[in-house]
């Protein structure tokens, strides 16, 4: 009895301490809780990346055992470094057959030019500035993501969705020299403004988004779908009445502006190089190492890609299964809790990818913009489920680093 009483007495201070921590945590402002979550998740990713950096051998990007900043600036980071230093080429590089090869025109200008401006002001290195721009943009994206989830989910679910956002397998993008974090911040802000029906305020955000990541056409499609639903089934968008000719003008303007900015970069590449298909041919260069040089035929790249990876007819069958699975997730009754706007964005972005993107090892990174669908993943309240989901995300993050980021000899799986 005495032993049992002593054990109970010893556990009381521990329980009291845990209770105090939980209470204090719940009393913190939502933005401070998200900041803590984001900071802890970035520490975790830093540990994982540093582990790979310690075993990294010399390669075309870095020396053996590079510093964290050097290791975080490889792959596309090398292209952004070139753009920040010298801008874009006026003459496209070509191979012996006359086909355009990989070059800087594949990358939008907002991120590298922002980095260059800050380098000029601070005198800091590209690696330092580029990683910090991504880190701060990722922090902003996490805060906006929580606000966006909070429009549809209760605080607990919204916070858990943000935890998943912070530890997702490709959340590495929040602390490397890539434009994804900056692009995601702008995208989430545009979606939040859409949910708030602040259409005119969306315009500068959409303009910046379109020159940060190639999402202009997809966002334009989202706005077209939004207007159609607003006219035909306004209740699905929580609207008290149908969109009229007058009230449809603001979202229609956003759709037009987003579409134009989506076409602007190919037009700029044409104007600078004198080659009408400079941007398209540059993008095709990246897939030529898989399937050789071929023209872009909309809505065929995924059939080609799945055929290359899995052979036919297995590739096409698997592609159909993937698309049906995506539709099942987006249109299941439970998914209605995150709002039709976010689900329509997932559909619009997937349609855009199906039209132009060739699935390869960077597919996981390219899917980052559908992060708002994590709200569906966050719906179950089971603690076991939530812990298991976070653990799985961290394991997949390590797996992604192993297969896609770490350079292991001749690496053909770029992130």
Name every feature range the model reports, one short phrase each.
Residues 75-93, 97-123, 293-303:
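Short hydrophobic/aromatic helix or loop-helix immediately within or flanking a transmembrane segment
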Residues 41-58, 220-329, 342-346:
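Membrane-lumen/periplasm interface segments of specific transmembrane helices
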Residues 335-357, 366, 389:
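Transmembrane alpha-helix segments characteristic
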Residues 190-201, 381:
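Membrane-interface transmembrane helices that cradle and orient dolichyl/undecaprenyl
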Residues 99-100, 105, 109, 113, ...:
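Loop-to-helix entry region of an early transmembrane alpha helix in multi-pass inner-membrane enzymes
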Residues 133-136, 152-156, 160-192, 209-219, ...:
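Multi-pass, polyprenyl lipid-linked donor-dependent membrane glycosyltransferases
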Residues 117, 129-152, 325-331:
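Transmembrane-helix motifs of polytopic, lipid-linked glycan transferases
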Residues 125-129, 145-167, 342-344:
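Transmembrane-helix signature of polytopic, membrane-embedded enzymes
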């Amino acid at each position: 009895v005495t032993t049992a009483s002593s054990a109970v007495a010893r556990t009381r201070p521990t329980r009291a301490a845990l209770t105090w921590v939980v209470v204090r945590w719940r009393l913190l402002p939502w933005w401070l809780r998200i900041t803590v979550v984001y900071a802890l998740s970035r520490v975790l990713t830093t540990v994982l990346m540093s582990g790979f950096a310690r075993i990294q051998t010399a390669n075309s990007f870095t020396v053996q055992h590079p510093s964290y900043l050097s290791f975080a600036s490889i792959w596309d980071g090398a292209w952004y470094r070139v753009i920040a230093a010298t801008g874009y080429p006026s003459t496209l590089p070509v191979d012996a057959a006359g086909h355009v090869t990989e070059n800087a025109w594949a990358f939008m200008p907002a991120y590298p030019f922002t980095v260059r401006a800050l380098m000029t002001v601070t005198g800091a290195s590209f690696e330092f500035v580029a990683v910090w721009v991504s880190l701060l943009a990722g922090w902003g994206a996490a805060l906006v993501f929580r606000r966006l989830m909070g429009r549809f989910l209760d605080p607990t679910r919204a916070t858990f969705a943000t935890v998943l956002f912070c530890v997702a397998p490709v959340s590495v993008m929040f602390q490397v020299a890539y434009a994804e974090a900056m692009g995601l911040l702008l995208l989430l802000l545009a979606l939040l403004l859409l949910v708030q029906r602040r259409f005119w305020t969306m315009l500068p955000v959409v303009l910046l988004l379109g020159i940060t990541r190639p999402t202009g056409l997809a966002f334009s499609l989202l706005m077209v779908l939004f207007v159609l639903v607003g006219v035909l089934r306004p209740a699905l968008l929580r609207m008290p009445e149908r969109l009229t000719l007058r009230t449809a003008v603001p979202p229609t303007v956003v759709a037009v502006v987003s579409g134009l900015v989506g076409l602007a970069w190919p037009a700029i590449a044409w104007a600078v190089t004198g080659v009408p298909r400079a941007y398209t041919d540059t993008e095709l260069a990246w897939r030529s190492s898989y399937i050789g040089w071929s023209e872009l035929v909309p809505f065929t790249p995924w059939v080609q890609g799945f055929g290359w990876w899995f052979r036919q007819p297995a590739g096409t069958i698997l592609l159909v299964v993937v698309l049906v699975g995506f539709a099942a997730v987006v249109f299941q009754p439970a998914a209605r809790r995150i709002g039709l706007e976010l689900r329509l964005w997932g559909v619009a972005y997937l349609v855009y990818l199906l039209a132009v993107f060739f699935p390869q090892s960077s597919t996981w990174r390219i899917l980052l913009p559908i992060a708002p669908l994590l709200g569906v993943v966050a719906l179950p309240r089971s603690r076991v489920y939530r812990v298991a989901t976070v653990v799985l995300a961290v394991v997949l993050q390590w797996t992604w680093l192993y297969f896609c980021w770490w350079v292991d000899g001749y690496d053909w799986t770029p992130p």
